[in-house]
Curated annotation (Swiss-Prot):
The modification Phosphoserine is found at residues 686, 905, 1018. Residues 941-950, 1138-1150 have a biased composition (Low complexity). Signal peptide: none annotated. It is found in: Cytoplasm. Keywords: Cytoplasm, Phosphoprotein. One of its GO terms (biological process) is eisosome assembly. The keyword Phosphoprotein applies. It comes from the Eukaryota. Residues 115-152, 397-426, 705-870, 890-1017, 1029-1107, 1135-1154 are annotated as: Disordered. It comes from Schizosaccharomyces pombe (strain 972 / ATCC 24843). InterPro entries: Eisosome1. Residues 705-767, 783-792, 849-863, 891-902, 920-932, 999-1011, 1032-1045 have a biased composition (Basic and acidic residues). One of its GO terms (cellular component) is eisosome. This is Uncharacterized protein C63.14.
């Protein structure tokens, strides 16, 4: 324990569990804080071997087989053996004997009975026995006395007999006082005081030991260092001191190894065989004497009993402890001097050497065994230089378990009131491994007394036989060469249950598995690979060689006489000499002792019992053990006399050097203990090495998993992108389909509207022509806006025969509900050929095909019998105009059809055309009426022109108030004479010639099929296919009503349309005009700015001027018309019919442009936008 200044730090339960626990009492006053350590003021300073003597009893003895077998069932696999605690408790109860009743705090007290010879010889006692007894006495002086319930009443009560004379046979010191016990005290107190005085007297004369015969080089500081190492590294000194404590000399490690194992690691020839038996005998006897006293003062509490009153018990403990401590003189001046010196050094070197001095004085005596079972945990705290007294090592945390089998040692703690002497908390600084601290004076003495009873007058053979048997079991129990953790486990468990598979590999596999489990990897694969790495790992310990001492550091030469220096002693070695014998052991006994009851021969590095295969090894071990303590103590005393004048004190220099070396050794050992992992077979591995092994196996796996994960992510991204693109394409297709559907619906709607409007216009035109025929010319309406001309798609495929029949039947039965045909033709003006859209109404759609054919035949016959002297070119021109009137523009755009019709058209007389037109205009007239009409027309024609002339009228557009009529008269000789007449009308419109069809017999089959109303190629069938859906009639009517209301609100006059035709019938005769049309002007301009008839675009102003119903702002902006026609829209439509036109159409060749062949793609047909406020069809809303 640490003693700094004038106060003492009380050890905690973590430092002194079990028999040595200081928590069993709590002094009520600060006066009790002056209780010094268990062994007084540093007993190792006054004589170090006295401290060691009480510690090493267990190492020289063995437990009885019956006790091992009895408690083998209580074995723990990886923890401290509960059997160990039970065994110590049993030894304490057995060693204690009843005594007379005490008057303090117990009803029945005990004293110690120890049987020995009535006249003990001086040779029996070891010089260290007194100091050992004093140490044991001080350890138990502050503990309560045992309860009478744990002591058998059959024991006789006798006082403990301490020798009162000189303890050395050859000592020059006078004999001590023969006074029995101090007077004036109670019997127990007198006995305590007498034992203490005797122990101090024996220790004071220990330096007068006779001169030794064996020389050694182990000085006193080295022996102190060995004692210190034993206290803190009990079973690790030989294994780890050489490797992790470089500043401690090899002699210190060797001495520590001897103290730890009880077997000097030296060749047997170094020691003198004469001292073997005597030294061992004295040592064992005196250890038993000291242990008997310690066991008598032990207190065992059964768990089944009712717990005592802790308050009253504590008060009794405090009062009794204070009274006894005040009466005992156990504190020396040397201890106070050392405490003061250590305190000064710590304060002076707090920053620089705090780590070196930390924990030295405090932990010198912290070597008590731990009867409480602890559970190992991983380190939780680390070393800190600023707080050297509280955080010196990387600590191991232990968790106390419950009591085992009902027997525990009750402990109580005392808290210090001084701040600088505060004991660190349990979890922060256990300065040693409690799991390994099992070689203390109390438990060692108990086991020694339990297992060894010296005979009254033993013989050499008996002693050697018993000693050899004990040493053999001890060495076998060490399981060398193993690391400290396995050694400590072996010491705390019966040998029958030691299984290296659970002891050695359990911890390494558990830690490795837990670490790898945190990585979330494949544990099965990783564990197998890790096990392979561990098996092939080269252990840290070198190959063991026979009879070798501890290996010194490589940078420090060995001062010992050992030729080889491994770190551990191995019982597998082969004896160098073959003449050793097992003294006093029969082969049967040897076989019994060497039999192993656990099955691990195939799993350990050595497979046979070393004492069975090499009998000489047992003798060497026994002899070296007997020589160990006595020879070491003699050498120390001899060298100490020459080194110091006062042998009771140690130089301050030696103490400082020892503190520095041991502090560093403790830190290194604690760090190694915290980090070293035992992998079995005497091998340890650091966490860094284990991590490297694990990473070597894990990294390829992790890399592969990462690569696979990256590939999988890329694949998912690609799949996602493909899915997105597919969805986008699908959406685009859906939108396109929707747009196409909307476009077709809009086109269909426009076609319906155009068809209905055309029908309405035809009806109104028919009424207007009738009015003109009856009453004369009427001013046409004035339109400010235009409608978009009709556009016909390409000719559809021929319908099947069923569809043809259906179309024929439909044309016969539909009557006036049919749509009229619409065509485009050129109206010839002054300077331009303006493409106008004309609606020709065939009013006889309701007739049957048979009636129609009859009418056509009649017209054809009339044409044959009429005027036959008409020029063929004139007839061709007349036929062309007839075709333009009947066949839609789509048919005329077909060059093959147009050329066929034009080329094969015969000449016929204009009278036939007039008669045919008249017949067509009156489909329901009787034969008499038609004949009368024809005769009237013929007569008028004869009167107006001679027979040798044929008159052809061309109506040109004039000014806003005039219609210019140009008449071309062709003589018999072919000369043409043109006359122009101007007729003033209100609002003229362009008119084109309308003549009847040529005779059918002169047409080819294609033309006949086109002209036949029943043919699918006829305009009637074409209109039927184009305008099947007539459901928008109400919508058109509603639209026309709205447009009419707008125009009426604007104050415009609604005038019926008018038309000028070639009818030469009598004025007043009620006949329909030959041509019923309604024109919609659309400008046709060549792409280079020239108009259709070859004149410059400047003439277009005249055209616009003669178009009263055309809004100037709606004229397309093409060519050089930009200034005059601002804001118009231009669009390119289908190819324009390139029918040749000119001022005179009789010969089919234009006189203005006779040599120019025109192409339809050179012209742009501009559909004039509807920008006027005047609606379409507003003039006809009354008729709807």
């Amino acid at each position: 324990m640490s003693t700094l200044g004038n106060s003492t730090v009380k050890p905690t339960n973590a430092e002194f569990p079990g028999l040595h626990a200081m928590e069993r009492y709590k002094p009520a006053t600060s006066e009790s804080l002056y209780v010094k350590g268990h062994y007084g003021p540093h007993p190792h300073k006054e004589h170090p071997a006295a401290y060691v003597a009480a510690k090493t009893g267990f190492n020289a003895t063995s437990r009885r087989q019956s006790v091992r077998e009895h408690h083998s069932s209580h074995e723990g696999s990886a923890q401290l053996n509960p059997d160990r605690i039970l065994y110590m408790s049993a030894g304490a109860v057995t060693a204690a004997v009843p005594n007379k009743e005490h008057t303090d705090n117990v009803t029945t007290s005990q004293t110690i009975r120890y049987e020995t010879s009535s006249q003990p010889s001086q040779e029996v006692y070891h010089p260290h026995a007194g100091k050992a007894a004093q140490s044991a006495h001080v350890m138990n002086s502050t503990e309560s006395r045992p309860s009478s319930a744990h002591v058998s009443s059959s024991y006789t009560q006798k006082p403990f007999a301490f020798p009162l004379g000189p303890v050395f046979a050859t000592s020059s010191q006078a004999a001590a006082s023969e006074t029995a016990l101090p007077s004036g005290y109670e019997p127990d107190e007198a006995r305590f005081i007498g034992a203490s005085q005797l122990a101090k007297l024996s220790a004071s004369h220990a330096h007068q030991t006779p001169a030794q015969t064996v020389d050694d080089d182990v000085p006193l500081p080295t022996r102190m260092a060995a004692t210190e190492l034993v206290g803190h590294i009990p079973l690790r000194a030989a294994n780890y001191a050489n490797e992790y404590s470089q500043d401690v000399p090899a002699s210190t490690h060797r001495a520590a190894s001897e103290l730890v194992h009880g077997v000097p690691m030296r060749a047997s020839g170094i020691n003198d065989p004469k001292h073997d038996l005597d030294a061992a005998t004295r040592h064992n006897i005196n250890s038993v004497a000291a242990a008997s006293y310690v066991a008598a003062r032990s207190r065992v509490i059964e768990e089944e009993e009712e717990p005592p009153n802790e308050v009253k018990e504590r008060m009794d403990y405090e009062a009794d402890a204070q009274r006894r401590i005040r009466k005992m003189n156990v504190f020396g001046s040397a201890g106070a001097a050392l405490r003061e010196r250590t305190q000064q050094d710590l304060m002076a070197n707090e920053q620089e050497h705090s780590g070196e001095f930390a924990g030295f004085s405090r932990n010198l005596t912290n070597t008590a065994a731990a009867p409480t079972t602890y559970e190992y945990k991983r380190p939780t705290s680390s070393y800190t230089a600023k707080d050297a007294t509280s955080k010196v090592y990387r600590s191991n945390t232990y968790k106390p378990k419950s009591s085992v089998n009902g027997s525990v040692y009750r402990s109580k703690s005392v808290k210090s009131t001084t701040s600088h002497n505060k004991v660190p908390e349990r979890n922060s600084v256990p300065a040693y491994n409690e799991k390994l601290m099992h070689s203390s004076a109390a438990n060692a003495a108990i086991l020694s007394h339990k297992n060894y009873s010296p005979p009254v007058q033993p013989t050499r053979d008996d002693e050697v036989s018993q000693e050899d048997a004990r040493v053999k079991e001890i060495v076998r129990g060490m399981k060398l060469p193993l690391t400290s953790s396995s050694l400590s486990a072996a010491a705390y468990r019966p040998m029958e249950k030691q299984d290296p598979a659970t002891v050695e590999r359990h911890h390494i596999q558990a830690e490795a598995t837990q670490r790898v489990r945190d990585m979330k990897l494949d544990l099965t694969k990783l564990e197998s690979k890790t096990n392979d790495e561990i098996r092939s790992y080269r252990p840290r310990n070198v190959v063991i060689k026979p009879y070798a001492a501890a290996t010194p550091p490589k940078n420090i030469p060995s001062t010992y006489r050992a030729p080889q220096a491994p770190s551990v002693l191995s019982p597998v070695v082969t004896a160098s000499e073959g003449d050793f014998e097992l003294d006093g052991i029969t082969p049967e006994r040897q076989q019994t002792m060497t039999r192993s009851t656990y099955q691990e021969s195939s799993q350990r590095p050595f497979h046979e019992d070393p004492f069975r295969t090499h009998p000489g090894l047992l003798q060497a071990v026994a002899r070296n053990h007997r020589n160990s303590l006595a020879n070491i103590d003699e050498r120390i005393m001899r060298q100490n006399q020459a080194a110091t004048a006062n042998t009771n004190t140690v130089s301050e220099t030696d103490i400082e050097a020892l503190e520095r070396r041991l502090s560093k050794a403790y830190r290194m050992e604690a760090q190694e203990e915290a980090y070293a992992i035992n992998i079995g077979g005497g091998r340890v591995i650091s966490p860094e090495e284990l991590e490297e092994i694990a990473r070597r196996n894990v990294d390829p796996m992790v890399s592969e998993l990462s690569e696979r994960a990256a590939q999988e992510r890329e694949r998912k991204e690609q799949a996602k992108e493909a899915k997105r693109l597919k969805k986008l394409a699908k959406e685009e297709k859906r939108l396109k389909k929707k747009e196409e559907k909307a476009r077709k619906a809009e086109e269909k709607r426009l076609q319906k509207e155009r068809a209905k409007y055309a029908k309405q216009m035809s009806r109104e035109s028919a009424h207007a022509d009738q009015a003109i025929a009856n009453t004369g010319p009427v001013a046409p309406p004035y339109f400010e806006h235009e409608t978009e001309p009709s556009h016909y798609e390409e000719e559809e495929e021929e319908e099947p025969e069923e569809r043809r029949e259906e179309s024929s039947h439909f044309s016969e039965s539909s009557g006036n509900n049919e749509f009229e045909e619409t065509e485009q033709e050129y109206t010839h003006g002054y300077g331009n050929d303006v493409l106008v859209q004309r609606t020709d109404v065939v009013n006889n759609f309701g007739e049957s095909s048979h009636a129609h054919d009859n009418a056509v035949n009649e017209k054809r016959d009339l044409g044959r019998n009429g005027f036959g002297d008409v020029d063929e070119q004139d007839a061709t021109e007349v036929y062309r105009h007839s075709i333009e009137r009947i066949v839609p523009g789509d048919y005329l755009h077909d060059e093959k059809t147009r050329d066929t019709l034009t080329r094969e058209s015969p000449a016929f007389r204009s009278e036939e055309a007039v008669v045919e037109v008249a017949d067509e205009d009156h489909p329901h007239a009787s034969e008499a009426e038609r004949a009368h009409s024809y005769s009237n027309r013929k007569q008028a024609s004869s009167e107006s022109s001679p027979e040798s002339q044929s008159t052809h009228y061309n109506d040109y557009e004039g000014t806003e108030d005039n219609i210019v009529r140009q008449t071309t008269t062709v003589d018999e000789d072919g000369h043409q004479e043109q006359t122009t007449s101007t007729t003033k009308v209100a609002h003229p419109i362009p008119v084109s010639n309308g003549l009847s069809s040529p005779p059918r017999e002169r047409l080819d089959d294609n033309a006949k099929e086109i002209l036949s109303r029943s043919s699918p190629k006829s305009p009637v069938a074409w209109f039927k296919r184009k305008f099947k859906n007539r459901k928008d009639k109400a919508a058109v009517k509603r639209m026309l009503e709205e447009d009419s209301s707008k125009q009426l609100s604007s104050g415009r006059d609604v005038v019926a349309p008018t038309s000028v035709n070639h009818d030469v019938s009598h004025v007043g005769e009620s006949t329909k005009p030959a041509v019923n049309n309604s024109t919609k002007p659309v400008a046709v301009t060549s792409k280079n700015g020239h108009s259709r008839n070859g004149s410059h675009a400047a003439h277009s102003n005249n055209v616009i001027g003669t178009q009263p119903h055309v809004n100037v702002s709606a004229v397309p902006n093409t060519g050089n018309l930009k200034d005059a026609l601002e804001g118009s829209a231009v669009s390119k439509t289908d190819d324009v019919d390139n029918v040749v036109s000119g001022h005179s159409n009789v010969n089919g060749v234009s006189k203005s442009r006779p040599n120019i062949v025109e192409r339809s793609e050179d012209y742009v047909i501009s559909h004039l936008p509807e920008q006027s406020r005047a609606p379409i069809g507003a003039a006809f809303q009354e008729d709807l």
